[in-house]
């Protein structure tokens, strides 16, 4: 039976925020993308309703999704620290009150998904929800990243609720369930929920990154299970049936074209029953080619 998570025990807190393991000095790190790339991704777009009770409040390529319920709001991801004022303004432009935000859900703890969480939490008083590994990285502000070291830090923030596989957060009749999809980061988490509209049920999948950009895949001393983890995540996400597929980067779920279709009057523009499988297949092909290339160099 899936556990409904409503609080974080003192014991769990102690386990999650104990002393952090240092990175292995013998393991080379990957080159971090330039911050200018994130700034390009953070260009503004107007907020809009994607589907009843589901709103896009993020940037051009950094997803931030707001879910509304009779008991308050849930936010998934918060882009860059510099994006936080924009996300807040988007929420308020849609007619919502930032103080009604109850939960901030994290997919993975890097600056482009988690950078704005600290400010969003401070403004709203919402509880931050993350996997144990993500919670450690959130507390470190992204430092000691297994692939990037301290290159892309962000304002640290404490997680209030720790989730594992199959755990869920419930608010106002809406249940969000965690699907562990490690590989991009050890704590990477996708999120599942079911929406009800017009007498029908729609399965929404918010998929985390499946990318391994410039990672050292073979015998990575900072993340020995990387290859097994990402392959397991391909399998886990491929087994999901999504009516509405959202990813934490807009390009991964064709955000721009779907926005245009919505603006043209297609109210089902974000209903996409093939998108998740295509995303997984493309990601897996890219990964296997990257792995083969590294194996050939050995």
Residue ranges and their predicted role:
Residues 24-34, 43-44, 49-51, 73, 80-82, 100, 158, 168-171, ...:
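Metallo-beta-lactamase
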């Amino acid at each position: 039976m899936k556990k409904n998570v409503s609080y974080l025990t003192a014991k769990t807190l102690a386990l999650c925020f104990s002393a952090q393991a240092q990175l292995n000095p013998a393991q080379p790190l990957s080159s971090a993308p330039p911050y200018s790339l994130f700034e390009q991704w953070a260009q503004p777009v107007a907020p809009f309703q994607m589907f009843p009770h589901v709103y896009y409040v993020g940037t051009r390529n950094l997803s931030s999704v707001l879910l509304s319920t009779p008991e308050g709001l849930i936010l998934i991801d918060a882009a860059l620290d510099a994006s936080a004022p924009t996300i807040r303004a988007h929420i308020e432009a849609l007619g919502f009150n930032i103080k009604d935000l109850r939960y901030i859900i994290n997919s993975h703890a890097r600056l482009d998904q988690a950078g704005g969480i600290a400010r969003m939490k401070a403004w709203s008083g919402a509880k931050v929800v993350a996997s144990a590994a993500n919670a450690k990285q959130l507390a470190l502000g992204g430092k000691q990243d297994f692939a990037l070291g301290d290159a892309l830090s962000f304002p640290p923030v404490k997680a209030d609720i720790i989730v594992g596989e199959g755990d869920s957060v419930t608010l106002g009749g809406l249940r969000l369930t965690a699907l562990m999809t490690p590989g991009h980061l050890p704590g990477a988490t996708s999120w599942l929920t079911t929406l009800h509209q017009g007498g029908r049920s729609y399965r929404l999948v918010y998929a985390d990154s499946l990318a391994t950009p410039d990672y050292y895949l073979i015998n990575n001393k900072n993340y020995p299970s990387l290859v097994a983890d990402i392959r397991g995540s391909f399998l886990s996400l491929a087994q999901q049936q999504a009516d509405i597929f959202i990813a934490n980067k807009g390009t991964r779920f064709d955000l721009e074209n779907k926005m245009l279709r919505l603006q043209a009057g297609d109210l089902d523009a974000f209903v996409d029953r093939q998108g998740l499988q295509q995303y997984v297949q493309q990601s897996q092909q890219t990964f296997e080619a990257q792995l083969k290339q590294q194996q050939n160099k050995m």
